[in-house]
Regions:
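A short, flexible helix-boundary coil/loop motif
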Residues: 12-51, 56-59, 135, 258, ...
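Short, conserved catalytic/metal-binding motifs centered on acidic residues
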Residues: 68, 83-84, 95-101, 143-151, ...
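Short, charged amphipathic recognition helices of the HTH superfamily
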Residues: 74-89
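Active-site-proximal, Lys/Arg-enriched surface segment
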Residues: 101-177
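An internal, acidic/charged active-site-proximal segment
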Residues: 116, 187-299
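Short amphipathic alpha-helical "interface-anchor" segments enriched in bulky aromatics
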Residues: 315-343
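Basic, amphipathic alpha-helical segments enriched in Lys/Arg and hydrophobic/aromatic residues
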Residues: 343-367
Length: 448
């Protein structure tokens, strides 16, 4: 007989979870697994102990479900059936096909996954060697890059009655530019809109969700592409919620200069700044416009923001960093192979997005620990980057130009390499009962 025990009070759940969870046979964290595998998933299980939405379900425990979802995200199998078949061929006793997909529909499991995913992202430490010490003005800000990301529909999603096509599945994400933690903001509306606009989704979220748990008095700064522009909404968010936005000027915008802002031309961070202006918009509010010349690309850019205190060169560089969320989407799609929805239900699609975030964030933790504890770095890629920088310095010198100060100060690898992901898959899933082959990864990072 199948039994599922539901305990509603969080403190009761925590009490029984601490007693029973270590005794429930876990397919992913059993005693026979390596210390490396246990450490990789340990952050999820530590957060699970204190989660409000956990339940004692012996048939498929919450800890197994979390580990199973992350494994599904990292392994890159083309379908759920292929993933479950691979589990069976690997000697792992996974859930039945129907049970796996029914669990993806569960509202309670979605609430749990969302809770753990959000906590994991919030607890990710800043990446080492970043440039924030060069900009003390940002100490009072949480800084995110935000954007929408779409992938193919699920195999059993319905087709449109008019054109016979399936609508793409969209999600809106944020990337913490300090820690590179990926967070899920919301799934795109697939009921009333075929492709929800970014600003419509942001308005639907509201101030509380966009602040992502920031303390009262702390400012939250989003860098978004042109789809995130709504000047009236920017004004309301700034004065009602401490939210600030940065984007690029659209070609068809008619903005009137109504003032000039003072800025320090001697500050090396402002190299390339052409102007710092206050402009009037057609929506009856004014915004700040920073005009900037990028010596590396030989182009002029205009940035718009409702933040008026940061140096203009910092504003320009923050928009440069927006590209990192695009690189993260490329990591999900082309390196992890996540190109379509796992299932048709709205809960399943949202749960998939959270599992992708958890996989990304756990890989960052793993990569940082390997460097800190074993001195393993992607030396080959670092050497290639150094050569590119040297070549760029020489090119700019011939043109009697210099590389911007903040670009020189801020150099870091922004995505996980394919060779790291391949190595990780072997350690976690092909050799889960053996300690990791650190020497093999060091060799990969040094030569390929």
């Amino acid at each position: 007989m199948r039994v599922s025990v539901r305990l509603c009070l969080p403190w009761v759940v925590n009490f029984f979870a601490k007693i029973f969870m270590p005794c429930i046979p876990s397919l992913h964290t059993a005693r026979s697994t390596s210390t490396f595998t246990q450490n990789f998933f340990a952050p999820l299980l530590d957060l699970l102990i204190h989660a409000n939405h956990q339940r004692v379900c012996p048939e498929l425990t919450d800890q197994d479900w979390l580990c199973l979802g992350v494994r599904r995200a990292i392994e890159g199998r083309p379908s759920g059936r292929a993933f479950l078949q691979h589990l069976a061929l690997s000697g792992v006793e996974g859930p039945e096909h129907s049970h796996f997909f029914e669990t993806l529909k569960s509202a309670r499991r979605l609430a749990l996954v969302s809770e753990v995913s959000t906590a994991l992202a919030a607890g990710l430490p800043p990446l080492p060697g970043d440039w924030w010490k060069c900009v003390p003005e940002l100490a009072a800000f949480d800084v995110y890059a935000g954007d929408g990301h779409f992938h193919a529909a699920a195999a059993h999603d319905p087709r449109d009655a008019q054109d016979g096509c399936k609508d793409a599945v969209g999600h809106f994400f944020s990337l913490d530019l300090r820690s590179h933690a990926l967070g899920h903001l919301t799934a795109a509306d697939q009921v009333t809109r075929r492709k929800e606009h970014d600003m419509h989704a942001l308005k639907r979220l509201g101030v509380r969700s966009l602040r992502q748990g920031a303390a009262t008095g702390r400012k939250v700064f989003y860098v978004w592409d042109r789809a995130g522009i709504d000047f009236r909404q920017w004004h309301d968010w700034k004065h009602g919620g401490g939210l600030y936005f940065l984007s690029r000027e659209k070609e068809n915008m008619k903005l009137e200069v109504i003032g000039e802002n003072r800025w320090d031309r001697a500050d090396p961070r402002n190299a390339g700044v052409l102007g710092d202006e206050l402009v009037a918009t057609s929506q009856g509010v004014s915004v700040r416009r920073v005009r900037y010349y990028c010596a590396q690309r030989g182009e002029e850019f205009s940035f718009l923001t409702n933040e008026c205190t940061l140096p203009p060169g910092v504003i320009a560089h923050l928009y440069r960093l927006r590209w990192e969320i695009e690189k993260t989407f490329d990591e999900l799609k082309n390196k992890l192979g996540e190109t379509k929805a796992w299932a048709s239900s709205a809960n399943a699609k949202t749960m998939q997005a959270h599992f992708l975030c958890m996989a990304h964030n756990l890989m960052i933790r793993c990569e940082s620990e390997l460097e800190r504890e074993h001195g393993v770095r992607n030396e080959a890629e670092l050497a290639r980057r150094a050569k590119r920088l040297e070549k760029e310095h020489k090119r700019l010198a011939k043109e009697k130009a210099v590389m911007p100060f903040l670009v020189q100060a801020f150099q870091r690898l922004t995505v996980r390499s394919v060779k790291f992901i391949r190595w990780l898959r072997v350690q976690l899933f092909a050799r889960p009962h053996h300690e990791p082959d650190i020497a093999a990864l060091r060799h990969l990072f040094a030569t390929l």
